[in-house]
Amino acid sequence: MIRKSKKITKMRGSRTCGYGEAKKHRGAGHRGGRGNAGHQKHKWLSVCKFNPDYFGKYGFNRNPGLIKQLETINIGELEEYILKYKDAFQVEDGKVVVDATEIGFEKVLGKGRISTAMVVKAVEFSEGAKEKIEAAGGEFVEL
């Protein structure tokens, strides 16, 4: 077993126990404060050198009232919904009439495949959704 004497035992009788002058081991005064203290005062040069972007604001946050959060549904999911609940939708001229806002969606996106001709009413459509609806023989109506 290793028997190593502790540092404090070796330092007995040395007055300062390896901390230099007696004043240097009191509180945080020898360091100029604890942690980030003094970074805008006496430690400013070290901030400029090592962390220049620490202070100040950058960028901006958009006003949440200006951001549109639309509920979306893909065109493939919409067709599955129509096939699942056939009785809930009207058929005019061989096309199923779907109002996306009535089922809780504002925007129709273009992911998926459709084979049903339908008239889709929504607030917004993506370009892909418009193309797929027209390719299936349907039409879209923006509200």
Swiss-Prot record:
Q: Basic residues compositional bias: what residue ranges?
A: 1-13, 23-38
User: Molecular function (GO) terms listed?
Assistant: rRNA binding; structural constituent of ribosome
Q: Which PROSITE patterns match?
A: RIBOSOMAL_L15 (PS00475)
**Top-level division of the source organism's lineage:** Archaea
**UniProt cross-references to Pfam families, sorted A to Z:** Ribosomal_L27A
| InterPro entries for this protein | Rbsml_uL15_N (IPR027386), Ribosomal_uL15 (IPR030878), Ribosomal_uL15/eL18 (IPR021131), Ribosomal_uL15/eL18_sf (IPR036227), Ribosomal_uL15_CS (IPR001196)
The answer to whether keyword Ribonucleoprotein applies is yes
Q: Give a yes or no for keyword Ribonucleoprotein in this entry.
A: yes
**Which Gene3D superfamilies does the protein's record reference?**
3.100.10.10, 4.10.990.10
Entry keywords, A to Z:
Ribonucleoprotein, Ribosomal protein, RNA-binding, rRNA-binding
GO-annotated biological processes: translation
Cellular component, GO, one term: cytosolic large ribosomal subunit
Ranges where the record places region Disordered: 1-38
Q: How does it assemble?
A: Part of the 50S ribosomal subunit.
Q: In which family does this protein belong, per the annotation?
A: Belongs to the universal ribosomal protein uL15 family.
Function comment: Binds to the 23S rRNA.
* Official protein name in the record: Large ribosomal subunit protein uL15
Tell me what organism the protein belongs to: Methanococcus maripaludis (strain C6 / ATCC BAA-1332)
